[in-house]
């Protein structure tokens, strides 16, 4: 390392400050500084000289480091890194500040040394929800072990080539004897009893030590993507650089320093924090004390929040003191997070409701800003029902004064006053005076953004614990057992005033009527995108029914032996599972056993059978999946959440039940996931009318979904009621669900054509019956759902639960929850109107268990009326068997929370719950590039709502990703044996290199969007182009080899098709395949069965239609690739399924090593590669001029939980209003997606558009006929093909929206007014003769660049002038479409040059039609290809992920 170690800190601080101070004129210089920082940190991280020393080579080749296996060297390196971390923390900080909290910290350390040893933990404590604190080893023994580490022999050096088996055993024994033991008191170990509902004895025993250590490894694991020590160092140094005079100090790091001093002793090389991680972030373990890992996690999370949410505290002394107080409290009591959260629950709900004279002072009082300034929508009217087809924001202005004082006083009831008083006392009782002072600021009404900032600062601290993990068996039993008893009482009629008979007296007929009417509406074609498919259509679409969000399956384990190696695949891919099962997946018989507890089942057996089964269970000769199949039981999974919440159960639906639901209720879900096709006639869902209540009718990925509620809060004249029910699924009784299904059956039987000749599923227990009709499937599913038993498993402990309620893994969970919630809401609204001054409901919405109701507030003037509304709401939910907390049923005219969307006085904000470093579970990615691209998506999403500086936060994310981006590379000798392992870091520009380059991560430089090709071209190309050649070499090919090899194996008889598939060089000969699965439906299968199922689903009529269309197109000189032809759909589907398989990491983690190793000897100059080589459309675009603009919109800022630059964008451009571009959340057309989904195609929307352009059908004399033939060749379906062709011809002007939403959707520009008429204020496209639609696309390209510049200009707005290279555009257009024979004949042999200054066109014989050079772009232009966008392909919402 060129720098002396003592110089690293001041040098890095200087570099960071230069970057922070840079502006748009200094972008490239700032990036050069960033690359220097990355170089210094990488060298610091790896502790040895790299094998590529020249800086130019570093930029082109990356860095190589030898990987040491010497434990002493590794220990010394990490000790030095920890020492640097502590020196950085203390750098230029006065000693009194450093030692300010030493007494508290030493008390924390003393407590850690006095908690019980692990063997003193009682059985009850071992089973607690939160892992109890305990010691693993005393400090003296730990220090001795650290010394022993240094003398442990290197196992790899002892291996001899001719070593015998006995020598190996002796060597292993020596190794075990010399290896340190990190758990003291093994002689005190004992066995504890755990529950096991799948054993005859209902229990089993295990060692206490094993159980506690297994819990520790599971519940303390943060699932990082890189080692946390470099992350701590980077976060701290950036906080230092960003804070005033570099004086920031972390008492979390101070705690770590004192712990290292205490347990490491005087030797520097033993002073490492006793938590172990691998270089890839894998959790290895902890030493001495159980809760060191969670404390390290809290410290890293705390520093990250302070950096990325810096605008909340602005490094002010009071806010930092509050943060330190809470952090030290949690370090002292790491299991008290739930208690802290509970202490402020109601302050979190009823903030800013107390109206008093200070509220109208419009100034700063005691340091609190009471200035009245917020967005208001003056046109919002809630005196009558609001019935929008599409939710969107209206124009907002800035409100400077109160106009609704009556409601201000009415909502602050005595009950609410009591809640707040109790919470303030709770905080005081925790001995947190600074926090008490902070939360006291949340009581008074402050109608501006500062109260949201104060609330967010509190919530940030509540999220310090990251993802909370606990003993899920304990958590589940506590919740489910209590609810099960409550449900049984309700079902038995124990309470004569609240029971199932009273509920179903009104709910059952209403449910049945809704199911009946919506089914009839679908059958009669009222909802075009919802229909009941034929059995062949259903089977051909089966891959779309089993999406990533659908039913759960057990692991499918596949062993694939090729002529070169053996691959192991472990997957939960539903598509792979279906293709392995074939038609067996449609057989309900294996999952139709009556659910029984094991003890009950054994009683039904003869003594001999019972004894044999018990013996088989105890010996393990019967698998768990087979036993659960016999017992008719299903599995429960789990989800971890943040803010110390308990682990939530996820009930896993079996695939057969999921498919049954897809066939019978799937069309109902489809009817409610698309926007209204006609104006709603009322608020309510009746089946005939969808009403306005389903959130899925308005979802577009933005806050538009509840625009009416947010606007209502801006006026203060409407009353919002927010119902919060707990454990909705578990209290939604099956007895109230079945009537809806009965209504479906009733309609199907009336409309007999839908229930005849179609056999969707089979029941192999019924011989001589061809299959099950829809009405029979309804009967089967009603029987299936009446009672289930689910089994939860955790660390080998298993517990079975009887379930007579909605389970969360069902296809219809969200839909049916919404239906029942809407019906209850209607009852509430009718009673409120009757009993509370004729108060009418103006608007409502439900999203599963969430409900929001907006009432006309003109007749509300007293707290008694508000209290009455609360009582009516709570009682109606309770009478429906739901658990609702009156304290959490918020009634407010100014604030609310719904489906994780928060608002206050017309301002919108999000909870800071996204974790940057931690993950809920390990990434499913099979290589580091894929994993870090996923991490990049997390960074991007996190930074959009982090209330700090976007530039700083984006830089932070890039540095964290860059330090984690390393690849293990092996060097081989002449005999192809490994003789050295190296750690390779790609060129540092790989972090922002777009993802089209194999090793590019595509992270954002500006923070606005991913894959910022144009910005790189304009400002960073000199640096980025140096490394792109090598970055493109970093490819992980094992998954591609497996998918291609399997396709070649199973499609070996389809030689022409294989040729067209172009499987390429990544191909190996498959010699054998074996399957295993833990799923109870799996009975040993093969992918050939899935292929047979797909072949059988080919419709003969459609096949002939497809073939005829292919022939017709061929006669016009147009070829349809065989890979897309309808008759080859089964094969294409299987190949697509293989692409979902992930090879185990041991096989897939290595890249093309020989190419990379060759870089060490490569002396020739490595060529530069243009960033536009993979994105040629950007070669067309130049920014010819930039003029300063000194005007802003002058409007309000609605979106508060955004970075500083996000608010600057909103201020400059204007806040979101009106119907924006056709944003689908991921840039797709519902029409195209519906065509793909409804026909079971495997082509993506992108590929379909590309096929349309390149096929040449748009250049035919009758392009509409050509489109129909093309779509029919793919689908064989005439009706949907004609509809899509008509859509293409009719909707030409909107095709640019596809690319616009790829650019803007999900970015901060989503919060702005991005309508074209507004965009033209900031962008000019210098192409006056260009067709308007294409011109419009270039406007949006310039608009994104405008925003990127603004971010780097400190909010200074500029006008962007976009010019187009017309010669390149002409070549680009010509290259994007082949010239057909008919086109040649039409154009003639002599063509004039294309005149791009005019809208040049060819006159053709068809009346009133012309073909323009731009027509391909008007209809579906190449610009909609993925040359930019905020969604990496592997992490975007794809068609197959759409909810049914």
From Swiss-Prot:
Q: Which residues form the RdRp catalytic domain?
A: 690-897
| Outcome (variant: residue 279 to R) | In strain: Isolate H
Question: What are the GO cellular component annotations?
Answer: host cell cytoplasm; virion component
Against InterPro entries, the record matches this protein to: DNA/RNA_pol_sf, RNA-dir_pol_reovirus, RNA-dir_poll_phytoreovirus
Q: Name one GO molecular function term.
A: RNA binding
What EC numbers are recorded for this enzyme?
A: 2.7.7.48
One GO BP annotation is:
viral genome replication
Question: Which UniProt keywords are given for this protein, alphabetically ordered?
Answer: Host cytoplasm, Nucleotide-binding, Nucleotidyltransferase, RNA-directed RNA polymerase, Transferase, Viral RNA replication, Virion
Regarding protein family, the annotation reads: Belongs to the reoviridae RNA-directed RNA polymerase family.
- Mind telling me what this protein is named? RNA-directed RNA polymerase P1
Origin species, per record, is Rice dwarf virus (isolate Akita)
């Amino acid at each position: 390392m060129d720098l002396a170690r003592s110089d690293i800190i001041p040098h890095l601080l200087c570099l960071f400050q230069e970057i922070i101070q840079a502006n748009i004129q200094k972008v490239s210089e700032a990036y050069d500084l960033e690359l220097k920082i990355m170089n210094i940190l990488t060298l610091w991280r790896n502790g040895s000289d790299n094998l590529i020393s020249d800086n130019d080579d570093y930029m082109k080749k990356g860095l190589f480091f030898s990987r040491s296996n010497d434990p002493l060297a590794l220990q010394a390196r990490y000790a030095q890194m920890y020492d640097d971390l502590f020196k950085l923390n203390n750098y230029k900080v006065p000693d009194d500040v450093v030692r300010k909290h030493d007494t508290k910290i030493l008390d924390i350390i003393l407590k850690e040394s006095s908690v019980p040893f692990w063997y003193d933990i009682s059985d009850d404590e071992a089973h607690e929800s939160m892992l109890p604190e305990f010691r693993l080893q005393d400090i003296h023994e730990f220090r001795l072990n650290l010394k022993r580490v240094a003398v442990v022999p290197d196992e790899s050096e002892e291996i001899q080539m001719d070593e015998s088996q006995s020598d190996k055993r002796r060597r292993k024994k020596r190794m075990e004897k010399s290896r340190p033991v990190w758990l003291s008191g093994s002689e005190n170990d004992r066995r504890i009893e755990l529950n096991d509902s799948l054993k005859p004895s209902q229990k089993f025993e295990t060692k206490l030590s094993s159980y506690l250590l297994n819990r520790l490894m599971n519940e303390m694991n943060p699932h990082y993507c890189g080692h946390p020590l470099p992350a701590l160092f980077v976060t701290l140094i950036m906080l230092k650089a960003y804070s005033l005079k570099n004086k920031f100090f972390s008492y979390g790091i101070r705690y770590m320093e004192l712990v290292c001093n205490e347990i490491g002793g005087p030797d520097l090389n033993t002073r490492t924090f006793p938590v172990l991680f691998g270089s890839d972030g894998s959790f290895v373990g902890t030493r001495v004390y159980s809760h060191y890992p969670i404390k390290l996690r809290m410290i890293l999370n705390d520093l990250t929040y302070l950096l990325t949410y810096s605008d909340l505290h602005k490094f002010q002394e009071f806010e930092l003191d509050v943060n330190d107080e809470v952090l030290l409290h949690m370090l002292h009591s790491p299991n008290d997070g739930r208690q802290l959260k509970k202490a402020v629950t109601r302050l979190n709900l009823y903030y800013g409701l107390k109206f008093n004279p200070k509220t109208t002072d419009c100034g700063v009082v005691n340091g609190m800003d009471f200035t009245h300034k917020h967005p208001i929508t003056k046109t919002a009217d809630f005196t009558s029902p609001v019935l929008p087809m599409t939710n969107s924001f209206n124009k907002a202005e800035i409100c400077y004064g109160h106009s609704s004082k009556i409601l201000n006083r009415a909502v602050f009831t005595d009950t609410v006053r009591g809640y707040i008083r109790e919470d303030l006392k709770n905080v005081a009782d925790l001995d947190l005076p600074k926090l008490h002072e902070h939360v006291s600021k949340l009581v008074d009404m402050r109608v501006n953004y500062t109260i949201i900032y104060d609330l967010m600062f509190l919530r940030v601290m509540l999220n310090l614990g990251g993802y909370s993990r606990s003993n899920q068996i304990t958590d589940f039993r506590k919740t489910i057992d209590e609810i099960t008893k409550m449900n049984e009482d309700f079902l038995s009629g124990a309470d004569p005033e609240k029971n199932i008979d009273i509920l179903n007296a009104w709910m059952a007929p209403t449910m049945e009527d809704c199911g009946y009417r919506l089914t009839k509406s679908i059958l009669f074609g009222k909802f075009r995108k919802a229909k009941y498919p034929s059995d062949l259509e259903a089977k051909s679409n089966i891959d779309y029914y089993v999406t990533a969000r659908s039913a759960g399956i057990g692991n499918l384990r596949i062993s694939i032996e090729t002529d070169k190696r053996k691959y192991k695949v472990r997957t939960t891919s539903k598509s792979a599972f279906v293709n392995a099962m074939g038609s067996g997946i449609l057989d309900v018989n294996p999952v139709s056993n009556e659910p029984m507890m094991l003890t009950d089942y054994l009683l039904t057996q003869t003594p001999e059978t019972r004894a044999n089964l018990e013996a088989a269970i105890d010996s393990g000769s019967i698998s768990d999946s087979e036993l659960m199949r016999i017992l008719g039981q299903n599995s429960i999974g789990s989800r971890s959440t943040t803010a110390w919440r308990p682990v939530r159960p996820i009930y896993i639906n079996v695939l057969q039940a999921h498919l049954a639901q897809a066939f019978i209720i799937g069309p109902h879900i489809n009817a409610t996931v698309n926007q209204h096709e006609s104006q709603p006639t009322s608020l309510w869902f009746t089946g005939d009318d969808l009403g306005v209540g389903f959130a899925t009718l308005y979802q577009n990925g933005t806050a538009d979904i509840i625009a009416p509620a947010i606007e209502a809060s801006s006026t203060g004249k409407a009353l919002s009621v927010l119902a919060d029910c707990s454990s909705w699924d578990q209290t939604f009784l099956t007895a109230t669900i079945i009537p809806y299904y009965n209504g479906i059956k009733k309609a199907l039987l009336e409309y007999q054509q839908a229930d005849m000749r179609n056999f969707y599923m089979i029941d192999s227990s019924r011989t001589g019956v061809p299959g099950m009709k829809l009405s029979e499937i309804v009967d089967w599913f009603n029987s299936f759902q009446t009672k289930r038993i689910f089994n939860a498993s955790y660390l080998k402990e298993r517990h079975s639960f009887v379930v007579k309620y909605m389970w969360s893994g069902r296809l219809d969970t969200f839909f049916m929850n919404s239906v029942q919630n809407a019906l209850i809401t209607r009852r509430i609204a009718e009673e409120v109107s009757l009993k509370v001054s004729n108060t009418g409901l103006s608007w409502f919405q439900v999203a599963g268990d969430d409900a929001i109701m907006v009432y006309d507030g003109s007749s509300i003037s007293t707290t008694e009326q508000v209290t009455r509304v609360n009582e009516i709401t709570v009682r109606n939910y309770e009478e429906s068997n739901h658990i609702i907390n009156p304290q959490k049923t918020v009634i407010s005219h100014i604030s609310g929370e719904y489906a994780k969307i928060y608002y206050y006085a017309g301002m919108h904000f999000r909870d800071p719950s996204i974790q940057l470093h931690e993950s809920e579970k390990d990434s499913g990615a099979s290589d580091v590039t894929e994993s870090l691209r996923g991490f990049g998506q997390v960074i991007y999403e996190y930074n959009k709502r982090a209330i700090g500086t976007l530039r700083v936060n984006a830089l932070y994310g890039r540095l964290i990703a860059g330090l984690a981006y390393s690849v293990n590379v092996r060097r081989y000798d002449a005999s192809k044996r490994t003789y050295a392992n190296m750690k390779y870091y790609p060129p540092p520009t790989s972090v922002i290199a777009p993802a089209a380059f194999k090793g590019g991560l595509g992270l954002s430089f500006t923070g606005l969007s991913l894959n910022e090709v144009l910005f790189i071209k304009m400002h960073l190309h000199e640096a980025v182009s140096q490394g792109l050649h090598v970055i493109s070499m970093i490819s992980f090919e094992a998954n591609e080899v497996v998918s291609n090899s399997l396709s070649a194996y199973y499609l070996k008889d389809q030689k022409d098709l294989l040729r067209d598939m172009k499987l390429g060089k990544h191909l190996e000969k498959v010699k054998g395949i074996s399957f295993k699965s833990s799923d109870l439906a799996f009975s040993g299968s093969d992918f050939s069965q899935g292929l047979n199922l797909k072949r059988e689903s080919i419709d003969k009529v459609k096949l002939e239609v497809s073939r005829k269309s292919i022939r017709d197109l061929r006669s016009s000189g147009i070829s349809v690739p065989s890979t897309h032809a309808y008759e080859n759909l089964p094969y294409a589907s299987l190949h697509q399924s293989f692409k979902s398989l992930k090879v185990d990491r041991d096989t897939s983690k290595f890249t093309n090593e020989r190419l990379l190793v060759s870089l060490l000897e490569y002396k020739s100059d490595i060529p530069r590669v243009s960033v536009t080589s993979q994105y040629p459309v950007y070669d067309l675009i130049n920014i010819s001029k930039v003029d300063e603009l000194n005007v802003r919109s002058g409007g309000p800022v609605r979106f508060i939980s955004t970075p500083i630059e996000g608010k600057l964008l909103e201020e400059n451009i204007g806040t979101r209003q009106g119907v924006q571009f056709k944003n689908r959340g991921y840039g797709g057309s519902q029409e195209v997606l519906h065509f793909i989904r409804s026909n079971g195609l495997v082509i993506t929307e992108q590929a379909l558009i590309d096929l349309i352009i390149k096929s040449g059908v748009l250049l035919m004399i009758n392009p509409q006929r050509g489109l129909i033939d093309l779509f029919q060749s793919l689908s064989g379906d005439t009706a949907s093909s004609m509809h899509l062709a008509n859509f293409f011809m009719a909707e030409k002007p909107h095709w640019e929206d596809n690319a616009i939403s790829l650019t803007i959707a999900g970015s901060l520009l989503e919060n702005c007014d991005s309508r074209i008429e507004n965009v033209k204020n900031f962008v000019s496209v210098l192409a006056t003769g260009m067709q308007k639609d294409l011109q419009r696309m270039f406007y949006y390209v310039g608009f994104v660049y405008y925003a990127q510049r603004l971010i780097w200009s400190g909010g200074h707005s500029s006008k962007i002038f976009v010019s187009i290279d017309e010669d390149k555009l002409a070549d680009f257009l010509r290259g994007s479409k082949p010239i057909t024979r008919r086109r040649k004949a039409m154009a003639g042999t002599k063509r004039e040059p294309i005149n791009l200054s005019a809208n040049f066109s060819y006159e053709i014989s068809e009346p009133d039609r012309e073909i323009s050079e731009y027509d391909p772009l008007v209809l579906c232009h190449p610009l909609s290809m993925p040359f930019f966008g905020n969604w990496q392909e592997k992490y975007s919402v794809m068609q197959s992920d759409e909810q049914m």
